[in-house]
Amino acid sequence: MKFLNMIHFILCINQEKIEKVFERLIHRLHLQADAFTYKTGHNIVKIPIKDIIYFESEDHQIIIHYYTQNEYHKDSFYGLLDHVQKQLKSFQFLRIHKTYLVHHLYVRKYAYDKVYLSTGIELPIAQSKRKEIRAEQFAINRKESV
């Protein structure tokens, strides 16, 4: 009887791990399929979420920084960073500062007061956001390591 309980326990643990792996896989596939859409002038532009590095707010404009076909691009549109953040809530973007919304996939290193992106760019973390960013970073890393 104990042997059957052990097998059941092992299967349950493995089932949890398998479910988490599938969740991560689905999330990544979801990332590849989804795009961020915005209007600039008379054009409507669609950028794959996976290509977006970060958003920057300047006056009433949002500057979107992204890579596509191994080239760095930036574009701008009118809007609020709060609205962009809500729109991308399920895609692991971190609001590190009132002017920056960073895609977690492009963060190479977190320091106390800044993030280092894989593109070589350094962005400041607002003092009021440091504790929250560390907690979010820990949660994301924990999800990815399971």
Sequence positions of predicted segments:
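Output/docking surface of receiver
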Residues: 1-18
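Conserved binding/recognition cores within well-folded domains
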Residues: 17-118
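Short, charged, intrinsically disordered terminal tails
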Residues: 138-146
